[in-house]
Amino acid sequence: EAIERELPSFLRSYFVYLKGNVLPMSRLAYLQDVRFFFDYLISNTSLTDADVPKDIKLEEIRDITSMDVNLFIDFCRKYTVDDGDKLIIYENNNKTLARKKSSVSVMFKQLYRDGFVDNNITDGFDPIKVPKPGEREIKALQDDEVMVMLDAVTTGSNMTPHERKYWEKTKLRDKAILMLFLTYGLRLSELQQLNISSFNFSRGEFTIYRKRGKESSMPINQSVQMTIQDYINNERSSINEETEVDEDALFLSLQGRRMTSRSIRELVKKYTAI
């Protein structure tokens, strides 16, 4: 919240979006990246007359182009900071650059959705290649990779037209799976066995079915609860109307059947590879 006070007030809905859609461990990194972007605008461009990020005007943001953001990402590859006594050189790999791009992309997409800017300039952002996981494993994720993955499942970024067409039908389900996977570290079998009845939203908890039939109760945080309820109310319910379904299973295929552990594994692998 301290960083939020250092940024312009027109980003208020962006802050709200982050609280509702991004894991707490990643939200701070988003805000730090956006603040760094604004510091860059002040110190390295003529795009603003402000002396501090908070004073940057919405009119100045409206004039920013995709080329300006691409130049910022290129700047982030290697830059020098004067700390008073010495010059410090910073270098970032493609994974970190992809995270910074994701942070700025989400900000501009939110400004566009709010009607604060006329164009969605993120379509013109240059792609950044990042190493993909091996064919069989689900890799451990760093914070910056988590951010890229959650941005992809939330906005459909970095997808092929075919992937995006399928994502439109399952984006709320996919996000709910990833939020549970990332927040609680659930096994694929535990995700697969979750039911709607596993969740007691009024008490703020849910039940996990462990090996050998053991059950464990877990507290559910606000971001995860909102994501799951959004999926149940707005996406899963439409599947229920179109075909016979496993009525209590939480995660359904488009055919209305409980997803298998294998299909959940492939889903997680797909998003870790984006």
Task: Describe the residue ranges of each PLM region.
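Conserved catalytic core of the tyrosine transesterase superfamily
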Residues: 1-274
